[in-house]
């Protein structure tokens, strides 16, 4: 957005994760977080009559004063923390809340600044609780307060570090369980006696610039929401082109200027009725930020996007922040990242800048969604065969052959045995057709320019047999919505990405990559000197290389799924 641009930023692209600005340092471990623990200071010691109150709450895993009284998932960590401190109070000393406790309460009350709901951390309740502590509270009251703050702190710290929802609930192969923080140890060493507890907790957040940029735009869009009066732009049945009248010109100008697609210094005619000039340029800018070709025309899709309430954009930002927290905080090598809703792949430099980005085609939204996971690129195959999958062979190839026995020859396929022996690359007999149907014989497409994989594929072994590859239909990249594949990811101009992937292999520059793709040697496998992480992620809100926020359609419905999961689960 123009009024938000200060300087270019680097980005990977995750959301509702999108991966931008990833830290590439390796070897992060939890002990590093605790390398310099703060010296311990004792909290208030309980009397013999107060101890049972503490043990009762801790042992039961329940504090009735919490919005979510049951804290069973945190019970072990809570017990460990109090045992470490001799069953003394942690946040209260001499009947008063210690500075560290007040600092943590401030974070809980302002959890919305991180895209979280303060209600989940008793945010609105802390003011009254603090007031009650000024009124000669009983020891039981102090115990209830102290344990409530301990539980709420843990409930806040965990999602800040690795997200509220486990991505495996959606069958995404992203490991947040391996990122789980030893909460008792962290609070003991880094929070209870820290000079700046908020700074210690902030270290747990994703270290990526893209995450921070998106987080910074959250209050901006919340400001837009406060200005929104609910009025909509007039819908259209026919596309409005530059120079034509449009009933919503004044409203359109106000909106585009408010959100920064028209620069603040541009003067607009408050009585205009013709769609032209700065409005057209503003619409182009808006279209580009919302996954549309920037035509400048007001068609039904563009009007629908313009009428999307700010609250929806805020939700997209929050869902993407959640997905950011699912990702590893560091990588052994600069990664390759595919953001599905954006239809884009990025490769990163060691310093975190974007080495290159390319448009991609992803799996069909209905029936062939591309998976979400983290894997490692192991090798590249030049001029590959396309080994037709069993489902495509049975459900698509067989019907084609039944209609036309010469289908195999026309499309450069061949039928082979499990050992790779060619049975036919011409007309298919009934016996061979039965072998194809029963999967006793396999169908593959010969290498070459007409191969569906194009002239190269990038392999990262995975159960879904998904990989990055070229295409024999580059014209499809001109489409705004590009979910055309059976799950694999087609890359525009793949030679550039392949050269980047092979950059550490001696002798493999762009010219050699191009020559090999157009050479005569088929199915040539080149193993990588060092494996490269690859992430396939899903973020419907991102900040791009030009430092502009962009929003994309929820092509797979994963934003809706995550929204439901967050609504039904408490922290």
What are these regions (language model features)?
Residues 13-23:
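Bacterial N-terminal signal peptides
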Residues 68-116:
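N-terminal, post-signal-peptide region of Sec/Tat-exported proteins
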Residues 2, 25, 30-77, 81-83, ...:
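Well-ordered beta-sheet/strand-loop patches within structured domains
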């Amino acid at each position: 957005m123009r009024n938000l641009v200060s300087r270019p930023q680097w980005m990977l692209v995750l959301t509702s994760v999108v991966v931008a600005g990833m830290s590439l340092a390796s070897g992060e471990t939890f002990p590093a977080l605790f390398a310099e623990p703060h010296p311990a200071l004792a909290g208030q010691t309980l009397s013999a009559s107060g101890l049972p109150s503490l043990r009762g709450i801790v042992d039961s895993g329940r504090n009735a004063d919490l919005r979510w009284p049951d804290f069973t998932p945190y019970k072990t960590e809570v017990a460990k923390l109090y045992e470490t401190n001799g069953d003394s109070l942690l946040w209260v000393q001499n009947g008063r809340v210690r500075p560290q406790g007040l600092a943590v309460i401030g974070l809980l009350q302002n959890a919305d600044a991180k895209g979280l709901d303060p209600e989940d951390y008793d945010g609105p309740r802390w003011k009254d609780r603090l007031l009650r502590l000024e009124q000669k509270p009983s020891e039981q009251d102090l115990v209830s307060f102290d344990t409530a703050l301990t539980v709420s702190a843990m409930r806040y710290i965990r999602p800040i570090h690795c997200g509220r929802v486990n991505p495996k609930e959606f069958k995404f192969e992203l490991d947040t369980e391996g990122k789980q923080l030893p909460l008792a140890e962290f609070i003991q060493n880094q929070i209870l006696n820290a000079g700046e507890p908020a700074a210690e907790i902030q270290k747990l957040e994703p270290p990526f610039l893209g995450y921070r940029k998106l987080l910074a735009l959250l209050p901006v869009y919340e400001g837009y929401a406060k200005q929104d009066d609910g009025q909509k732009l007039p819908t259209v049945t026919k596309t409005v082109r530059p120079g034509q009248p449009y009933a919503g010109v004044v409203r359109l100008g106000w909106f585009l200027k408010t959100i920064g697609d028209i620069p603040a210094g541009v003067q607009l005619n408050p009585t205009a009725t013709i769609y032209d000039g700065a409005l057209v340029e503003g619409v182009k800018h808006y279209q580009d930020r919302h996954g549309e070709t920037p035509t400048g025309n007001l068609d039904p899709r563009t009007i629908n996007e313009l009428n999307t309430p700010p609250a929806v954009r805020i939700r997209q930002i929050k869902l993407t922040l959640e997905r950011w927290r699912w990702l590893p905080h560091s990588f052994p090598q600069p990664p390759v990242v595919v953001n599905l809703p954006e239809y884009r792949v990025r490769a990163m430099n060691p310093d975190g800048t974007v080495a290159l980005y390319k448009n991609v085609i992803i799996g069909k939204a209905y029936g062939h969604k591309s998976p979400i996971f983290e894997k490692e690129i192991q090798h590249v195959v030049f001029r590959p065969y396309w080994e037709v999958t069993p489902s495509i062979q049975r459900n698509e190839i067989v019907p084609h052959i039944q209609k036309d026995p010469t289908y195999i020859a026309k499309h450069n396929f061949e039928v082979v045995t499990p050992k790779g022996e060619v049975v036919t690359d011409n007309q298919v007999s009934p016996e061979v057709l039965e072998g194809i149907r029963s999967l006793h014989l396999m169908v593959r497409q010969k290498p070459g320019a007409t191969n569906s994989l194009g002239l190269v594929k990038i392999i990262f072994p995975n159960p879904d047999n998904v990989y990055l590859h070229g295409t024999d239909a580059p014209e499809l990249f001109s489409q705004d919505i590009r979910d055309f594949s059976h799950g694999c990811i087609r890359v525009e101009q793949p030679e550039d990405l392949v050269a980047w992937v092979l950059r550490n292999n001696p002798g493999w520059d762009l010219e050699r990559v191009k020559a090999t793709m157009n050479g005569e040697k088929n199915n040539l496998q080149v193993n990588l000197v060092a494996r490269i992480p690859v992430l396939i992620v899903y973020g419907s809100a991102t900040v791009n290389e030009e430092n502009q926020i962009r929003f994309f359609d929820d092509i797979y419905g994963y934003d809706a799924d995550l929204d439901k999961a967050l609504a039904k689960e408490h922290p």
